[in-house]
Amino acid sequence: MAKEEVKQKKTKEKEPDITFFHPDILEVPKDGGLPYLKGYRCKKCGQLDFKTEMCTNCWSEEFEMVPLSRRGKVYSFSDIYIGQQGLATPYIFAYVDLPENLRVFAQLEGEVDTYRCDEEVELTLGPIRMNNDNLPIISYKFKKIA
């Protein structure tokens, strides 16, 4: 192969895809818009839930996707000093209550010992661990509102 062909082939190589954690409930708009969590509203009874095969209220299997609020309040949290393999410690896990009456489990961004219950937080994205190719897995997290 000529040097020029090798150079062109290298420049055409695709950048590695970003791995998102739970793409079934996390939407990252390709147009650069703000990321959001996805809820699913039952078309029969209106029950709102995260991704599910069947409505937890009426057992219907028909849903419509609904963008959820990007802000919520910390319901409870735990500072983790000895954690699971692959996660740098310390870190914070929390349950965050969204205005849509849904509670989501997520990592909080920032230093331990800095959050309190009922504190308002906002959705953000960040790495949570590395995949098998040693590339970051990006997930939804929540952070303090500036």
Swiss-Prot record:
SUPFAM superfamilies: Nucleic acid-binding proteins. Keywords: Acyltransferase, Aromatic hydrocarbons catabolism, Metal-binding, Transferase, Zinc. It catalyses: (S)-2-benzoylsuccinyl-CoA + CoA = benzoyl-CoA + succinyl-CoA. It comes from the Bacteria. Contains an N-terminal rubredoxin-like zinc finger domain (residues 16-70) and an oligonucleotide/oligosaccharide binding (OB) C-terminal domain (residues 71-160). Binding of CoA to the BbsB subunit induces conformational changes of BbsA and BbsB, which may directly affect the turnover process of BbsAB. Pathway: Xenobiotic degradation; toluene degradation. Heterotetramer composed of two BbsA subunits and two BbsB subunits. Both BbsA and BbsB are essential for enzymatic activity. One of its GO terms (molecular function) is acyltransferase activity. Pfam families: OB_ChsH2_C (PF01796), zf-ChsH2 (PF12172). Zn(2+) binds at C42, C45, C55, C58. Belongs to the BbsA family. Its EC number is 2.3.1.310. This is Benzoylsuccinyl-CoA thiolase subunit BbsA. It comes from Geobacter metallireducens (strain ATCC 53774 / DSM 7210 / GS-15). The gene is bbsA. The keyword Transferase applies. Component of the BbsAB thiolase complex, which catalyzes the thiolytic cleavage of (S)-2-benzoylsuccinyl-CoA to succinyl-CoA and benzoyl-CoA, the final step of anaerobic toluene metabolism. The BbsA subunit critically contributes to an induced-fit process for productive binding of a CoA substrate into the active site of BbsB. One of its GO terms (biological process) is catabolic process.
